[in-house]
Design a protein with these regions (language model features):
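Short loop/turn segments that flank or connect secondary-structure elements
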Residues: 1-271
């Protein structure tokens, strides 16, 4: 769940023709050497609600336990939404390593491979829904693009080019079912963020709220976004619950917009 500025930047790149958009049946050069380099010294892996749900399936922990142990929460600087960044383990040599990185026979592997975060699963592909600059309908349906990388960071890209190793997009991103779930999740979340922006971006409403009110609102949103899915067992159950929670979140934001004193009710619920 990247912040708004990054998505706007991608939309601008798309409009300028600077992104290499790939269709499901297209191929791209890549070979994973299992070097573990992309799983170290990172601070940019954002966990969205679907990622956190999948990590509960992989670890057997509750949503809150996953966030507390494997996440770092912060407020999106432009979205004003609670975001969760993947936490890394500090090593004796000063490096940081993903908690889910394992090693076997000299090769690194992901301990939660079947449920790894979407950003990790699709690398070196990125995902974009290019929105119009005026916030209107998307210019592009959810699509994958090849991230620019010259091979200095990932040796697998160099090897794939030299040995002509290709991957099909739809297979690499987890198949049609994974793509279906991801797209539905994205549609639900996009509808919510559009509404949230209308509630609070106009006239800088969020910035004009006092710090306590901001904290209460963000706390309530964080619970709705990330923590209400412990009894979900399948992707479709998660999607149904997520849609319901985002409708509740929109209603809550509308109440806060219409009646600032509604924050007091939220504080009482939280207490």
């Amino acid at each position: 769940m990247p912040d708004v500025n990054y998505m706007k930047q991608l939309a601008e790149q798309f409009e300028k023709g600077e992104l290499k958009i790939l269709g499901d049946e297209e191929h791209f050069e890549f070979a994973c050497d299992q070097c573990g380099k992309c799983c170290r010294n990172r601070s940019d892996i954002i966990l969205n609600p679907l990622d956190i749900f999948h990590l509960t399936l992989a670890t057997g922990k509750t949503c809150k336990e996953v966030v507390d142990k494997y996440g770092e929460c912060y407020l999106g600087p432009s979205s004003h939404l609670p975001l969760v960044r993947l936490r890394y383990r500090e090593e004796l040599d000063g490096q940081t390593t993903c908690y889910f990185l394992g090693r076997r026979d000299g090769k690194f592997f992901c301990r939660v491979h079947e449920h790894k975060p979407g950003v990790c699963r699709t690398y070196p592909l990125g995902k974009i829904t290019a929105a119009a600059k005026d916030g209107g309908d998307p210019l592009l349906a959810p699509s994958f693009f090849l991230q620019e990388e010259d091979g200095t960071y990932c040796a697998g890209l160099k090897r794939a080019h030299a040995e002509h190793i290709n991957q099909k997009v739809i297979d690499w991103v987890g198949g049609p079912e994974r793509k279906r779930v991801s797209n539905i999740y994205g549609d639900i979340f996009s509808e919510f963020t559009k509404a949230y922006g209308k509630f609070f971006d106009k006239h800088n409403r969020f910035e004009r709220m006092d710090k306590v009110s901001q904290s209460v609102l963000v706390g309530a949103l964080g619970k709705m976004l990330y923590l209400e899915y412990d009894d979900c067992k399948t992707d479709d159950e998660f999607l149904e619950r997520f849609r319901f929670m985002m409708e509740l979140a929109k209603e809550m934001c509308q109440q806060v917009q219409q009646d600032p004193k509604y924050i007091i009710k939220l504080m009482q619920k939280a207490g």
